Each structure stands twice: as C-alpha cells, then as structure tokens.
C-alpha cells in the first residue's frame, strides 16, 4: 500500500493533499497539522467529495500525531509561517528553521525510509537544512520550487504564444526566489520547436520577467501567498516519485560540483524515480546562463548563512 503524508494543512498543504487524492497517487494520504481539528475537518471535507469526483484514496487528518504518518513512502513538508510586517529575514528563517527541523526529525522516527519533499519557505534553505539536520542521502531530500516556477514559466509562454500550456516545454533553474530564478528561454519549445522561432527576444524577456515575479504578483492580487499551483506542483513531484515515472523535473537538490556549485541546494533538472533523485541532469549552459546560475547560488548561500546565525545548524 502506498502512503503519502502532508505536514501542514494550510492552503498549500491541503491543496497538495486534495490533488494527490483526486489523482489517486497513493492509497492513503495523511494530513498532519498543529492546529486542533483543522486537518481532521479538511480530510473529512475532502472525503465527502470522493463519490462526486470518483476517487478511492483514503484521506486521514490528525493533530500532531506522528504515529499516524508511520511508513509513509513520501512526506511533503509545507509547515512554517509567512513573513510578517517588520520581521527580518533572519527572524523568519529562525522560526521556520525550528519548525521544519522538528517536523523532519519527527517524520524520520516513524518513516525512516521516506523521501522528503520540501515546500516550506525559504525553500532552498529549508531543503538544505533538512538534508543537513537529518543526514540522509541526497537523493531523498527534494525541494519543490523548480517544478512550480517552471509551470508558471510555461503558463506565461503559452499566454504569449496564444496556445495551450501543454503544448509548451520550458524550465526554470536556480533559486526559488524573485531575483534568483532563471527561466531558460533558450531551451523553451513550442510543439518541439524553439520558441524563439515564434517570439521576439524582447517578448521572451517579458515572459521571463513575468515568471520571476509570478509569486509576488499573485500575493499582491490575493493578499496572501498562492496555493493552487504550489500545492499542485508538490503533488506533481510526489506522483513522479510514487509512480516511478522517471520524469525530468526541475527541483532544489544538493549539489556536489554539478553546475560548478557545491554544498548548496538549488534548482536544477533531475530524474525522479521511486527512490527519489536518480540523477542530476547537467544542461549545456552558455556563459551568460552560467553567470546567472553562479549569482543565484551565491544569493541562496547568503540565505543559508542565516541558519548558522540563528543556531539551526
């Protein structure tokens, strides 16, 4: 029996669990939250859609009961707080690092062989923290960010082309942040052909810029962070793993010399299989793209330094 746990039953976590259940990715989906009754209520609400939507996945909600997460194949961590007015970057990292570290350690007690997918922000840094705190092999700790950023990139490309998003291929690498992500316009295709055959360089740069502020744009419109696409992106990564699909998906993973970087988690294309990361795919970047990736990694590394400042590592 396949089992997935989603820690954090907020907007993103609940959406992720709902997509996993609807697509019958696993036989059982467990939602765990610290707030009494929230995950139980959302699980019951979702289960009451099963006959309407035609899925058989069992959804279980629990409040801080990690025993119910036992023997999970994949665990998705969405826990953490959003940055509040007046809160410094270090303060946010300090709070979320404590939450994510505690969650990861509790999960490992009951699911020692689980693959861990991190959605909590700052995502690259929380992925790095999880890897270092747990001491797991790098193939088992995966940050979701690149999958979400690439989906947004493909959306903006499809809007510019006037086509369906499924007709477009595109990828975003680098850090999961407004100034650190790198939409690879040179590699993007439409019906198998380079998008540069259809869009001007100016238009491609507009698409890249829209992608980079995609999350911020939604926050401005919604008054809070987005949840449908982040939750679905998390579920997409989980499905690729659970079903051993061998898909190439951009994810934040631990680098040991790939793309010229080491001791850092950053977004790069990887092949996802049942055991997590099968391999990191190294794209033939040009000099400009290499420079952007180096700058992105430097920014992520600066954020990682705060983990030591707050005593998380």
Question: Which residue stretches match the model-derived regions?
Answer:
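C-terminal substrate-binding/catalytic lobe of Rossmann-fold NAD(P)-dependent dehydrogenases
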Residues: 134-140, 149-313
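Glycine-rich Rossmann-fold phosphate-binding loop(s) that bind the pyrophosphate
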Residues: 9-10
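N-terminal Rossmann-fold NAD(P) dinucleotide-binding loop
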Residues: 13-14
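Conserved N-terminal Rossmann-fold NAD(P) cofactor-binding segment
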Residues: 32-72, 301-310
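Extreme N-terminal starter segment of soluble prokaryotic enzymes
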Residues: 1-4
């Amino acid at each position: 029996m396949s089992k997935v746990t989603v820690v954090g039953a907020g907007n993103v976590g609940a959406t992720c669990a709902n997509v996993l259940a609807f697509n019958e990715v696993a036989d059982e989906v467990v939602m765990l939250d610290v707030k009494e009754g929230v995950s139980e209520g959302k699980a019951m609400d979702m289960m009451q859609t099963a006959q309407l939507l035609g899925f058989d996945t069992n959804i279980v909600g629990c409040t801080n009961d990690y025993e119910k997460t036992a023997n999970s194949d994949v665990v998705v961590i969405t826990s953490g707080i959003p940055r509040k007015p007046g809160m410094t970057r270090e303060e946010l990292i300090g709070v979320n690092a404590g939450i994510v570290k505690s969650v990861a350690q509790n999960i490992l007690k009951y699911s020692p062989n689980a693959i861990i997918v991190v959605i909590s922000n700052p995502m690259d840094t929380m992925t790095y923290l999880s890897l270092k705190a747990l001491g797991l092999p790098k193939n088992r700790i995966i940050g979701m960010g690149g999958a979400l950023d690439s989906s947004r990139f493909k959306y903006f490309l499809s809007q510019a082309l006037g086509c369906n998003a499924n007709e477009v291929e595109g990828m975003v690498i680098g850090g999961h942040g407004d100034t650190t992500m790198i939409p690879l316009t040179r590699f993007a295709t439409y019906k198998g052909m380079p998008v540069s055959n259809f869009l001007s360089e100016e238009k491609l740069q507009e698409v890249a810029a829209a992608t980079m502020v995609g999350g911020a744009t939604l926050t401005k419109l919604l008054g809070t962070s987005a949840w449908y696409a982040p939750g679905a992106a998390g579920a997409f990564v989980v499905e690729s793993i659970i079903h051993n699909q061998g898909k190439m998906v951009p994810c934040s993973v631990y680098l040991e010399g790939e793309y010229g970087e080491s001791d850092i988690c950053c977004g790069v294309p990887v092949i996802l299989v049942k055991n997590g990361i099968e391999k990191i795919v190294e794209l033939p970047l040009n000099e400009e793209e290499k420079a952007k990736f180096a700058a992105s990694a430097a920014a992520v590394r600066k954020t990682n330094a705060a983990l030591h400042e707050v005593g998380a590592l």
